[in-house]
Regions:
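Short edge beta-strand/loop segments characteristic of extracellular beta-sandwich folds
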Residues: 32-36, 139-147
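Beta-strand-rich modules
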Residues: 195-227, 239
Length: 239
């Protein structure tokens, strides 16, 4: 009999716990934002850069903050609760910009859906970007503008891919990108990628049947994994 009472009690505890979990309210709004420098949106590799998001009042630990990934166009989004206050933390050495030694945190008070701007100071900017495709020869150029002195340029590259998500990792592979390390601040860099050796089919390392590819340029600073990029360009190629 005691064993039966014990089992019934245990069953009730499980039921009440399940009800509490079922009644847990899910986030009801997306906190949205973008990475900017003087109002200008900063482009990066898709989902490489992250910020930490947490709600004040909790001890900051891996179980109380959320890693928010930044898309290639510099935007980010995370599910939160409307009307609450949150903090966004920049992490050192994860982006192509200067580490914030004084204030690395943005406080978002009483959030109700407004677009949050995360200000950063890049080491370099890629200005006056342009790209075209003549037949199957992709040509792109940009001007290297130094924002923060003291950091060497490791490389500048042109990357061509099958879709709009294109960078130094996501591209057509061998023959689908061109890189150079002979670059100085203030210089206009022009690079070309010849696609004539690629076939047209559905594999990741071939040209798409749509007749379009995407290309953009990127710059890597020595000692920083994350690159800064131009916007992607949609280019038609000849079959």
């Amino acid at each position: 009999m005691k064993k039966i009472y014990y089992l019934l009690s245990l069953l009730l505890v499980v039921c009440f716990t399940s009800c509490e979990l079922d009644n847990y309210e899910a986030p009801n709004i997306n906190l949205v934002g973008k990475v900017v420098y003087n109002g200008r949106q900063i482009y990066v590799r898709n989902n490489q850069v992250t910020f930490r998001l947490y709600e004040p009042g909790w001890e900051l630990s891996s179980s109380t903050y959320m890693d928010v990934q930044v898309a290639q166009d510099g935007t980010f989004s995370a599910g939160v609760y409307a009307g609450k206050t949150y903090k966004l933390i920049r992490q050192n050495n994860l982006g192509p910009w200067v580490n914030h030694t004084v204030n690395d945190t943005i406080t978002v008070n009483n959030y109700h859906g407004e677009v949050i701007e995360m200000p950063v100071t890049p080491y370099y900017l890629l200005d006056d970007a342009a790209a075209n495709c003549n037949g199957r020869l992709v040509t792109a150029s940009c001007k290297i503008t130094e924002v923060t002195p003291g950091q060497n340029i490791e490389k500048v590259g042109l990357y061509v891919g099958r879709n709009i998500i294109v960078d130094d990792v996501r591209n057509l592979g061998e023959g689908g990108y061109k890189e150079t390390n002979a670059v100085q601040a203030g210089q206009t860099v022009s690079l070309q990628v010849d696609l004539s050796g690629f076939s047209i089919n559905s594999t990741n390392t071939s040209l798409p049947q749509t007749g379009f590819v995407y290309a953009r340029m990127g710059l890597k600073v020595t000692g920083i994994d994350a690159m800064i990029f131009t916007e992607p360009f949609k280019l038609a190629f000849s079959e």
